[in-house]
Amino acid sequence: KPGLGISGGNLERDLKTILKIANNKNINFDLITSWIDNSKFRKKWCWEILKKFVLSVNKNPSIAILGLAYKENTNSIKNSPSLDLLERIKDKAVHIHDPVVDPNKIKYGTYFKSIDECIRNVDVLIISTPWEEYKKIDLNKLKNEMNGNVIIDPFRVLNSNLLIDLGFQYHTLGI
């Protein structure tokens, strides 16, 4: 299933190598170029939404990021879009939760063992990895625990209709 761009292992590197070989041999590989461009767009999507809808009105929001692994069911953060996002917001109050990523690998932000503690009093919630436990978040409780009302959920982990009914500003990737 689609993620926030090509991440993890070596696929991104391999595609760039194939593209370089194709360019050296004057072979048109627009398809691979399109994949790489789409990946770049997806990797920056959360950042672009955060800039447009949050940072434009609140220069110092508190932000919860749920998920650092590049995909669910792994502890790998290699080339994870979350790391790029963390680098961009390292001067903000950032709360972080991931069920399996080693907290010692995280350079920025404050790691929380529980989802509830992570989301408490934040202005923005970003779900960067669609872990199963994030689907079980009690949205009414979320409404009471958060200070703000912005949800950035590229994977549609949460129930968008209920979030909107509760007064959240909900952003997801695609339609």
What are these regions, as identified by a protein language model?
Residues 1-175:
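Structural/interface elements that position substrates and couple domains in central-metabolism enzymes
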